[in-house]
Amino acid sequence: MSLDSGKATLSEVYRMGVLILIRHGQSVWNAENRFTGWTDVDLSERGVGEAERAGDILSEIRFGVVHTSGLIRAQKTAEIIMSRNNVSGKIPVMKDQRLNERHYGDLQGLNKAETAEKHGAEQVHIWRRSFDVPPPGGESLKMNAERTIPYFEEEIVPDLKDGKNVLVSAHGNSLRSIVMHIESISPEEIVSLEIATGTPMFYKYDMESGELTRE
């Protein structure tokens, strides 16, 4: 599903059983090229604009529930999106730390380029992109997936089974874990998946088979 799809088309197609995943809009530390992790930084001006554009794209989808993390950048992205929604009305917003970004441990707050100069680009690449090697004091993608995927199965899938359209506003690595699970992507392949800020991803839920299909 392209981002420039007409609103009427989205409204007609996604009446029920759709999952929308979105990484929060650009944060202040994204703009400064810093490791963020669980540090609770706000959206940048660009990030607010990204959330507004996503809200316009999704404005005719009747959502039944929003799931988001415990961090303000994801929560605010969801708030902005829903403030531009024309059809959903007041809906529950579920906030849970299991959808948080990977914890980057000792790297949180550090500039990525400066960290690469200090520790070597190869080591920093391993910390950032390997599946099971955590940064010092932090989480690997594998550890992130071990909390994110159970949340997805226990809290999000039941909403889809109930016929709800579901918005999940979260983070690059928590969403990477969910996409890996949905699309059966291997650990070797998932580390190269890039998820852009503020860009909705559409999945259609089949009520009979329980399968999710990328649109």
Where are these regions (language model features)?
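Phosphate-coordination/substrate-recognition cap region in phosphate-metabolizing enzymes
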Residues: 4-7, 13-14, 52-125, 154, ...
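Residue-level preference for the first positions of well-ordered beta-strands
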Residues: 19, 163-169
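Loop-to-helix element that buttresses phosphate recognition and phosphoryl-transfer chemistry
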Residues: 20, 26-80, 84, 134-150, ...
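Histidine-centered divalent metal-coordination motifs
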Residues: 24, 171
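Extended, charge-rich low-complexity interaction segments
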Residues: 122-138
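A short, acidic, amphipathic alpha-helical segment used as a generic capping/interface helix at domain edges
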Residues: 149-156, 160
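GST superfamily/GST-like fold recognition
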Residues: 172-176, 212
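Short, well-ordered strand-loop elements centered on a beta-strand within folded domains, enriched
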Residues: 208-215
